[in-house]
Design a protein with these regions (language model features):
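Amphipathic, hydrophobic secondary-structure cores in small proteins
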Residues: 17-55
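C-terminal binding/interaction regions
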Residues: 4-10, 19, 58-77
Length: 77
């Protein structure tokens, strides 16, 4: 099972809609900021904490960049 199949199956298991390709990219961009400005463990935990808030992915990305001290966005992920 590849990553997209696993994500789709996990979403179905918990009764959620699977993320779109754009949403996956945004989550990975958020994880990258967290991991690159701290330690690797920050990536999944930041995504979980952000998800608990209900904030948009754009708001979470901006917050991560403020915390990480980055003013650039990732277009290469």
């Amino acid at each position: 099972m590849n990553a997209h199949e696993w994500i789709d199956a996990f979403a179905a298991e918990i009764g959620a809609e699977p993320p779109t390709a754009d949403e996956i990219k945004q989550v990975l961009d958020l994880a990258a900021v967290a991991a690159h400005s701290s330690e690797r463990i920050a990536a999944p935990v930041a995504c979980w904490v952000g998800g608990m808030t209900g904030a948009s992915l754009e708001e979470l990305q901006a917050a991560a960049e403020r915390v990480g001290g980055s003013s650039e966005t990732s277009d290469s992920a």
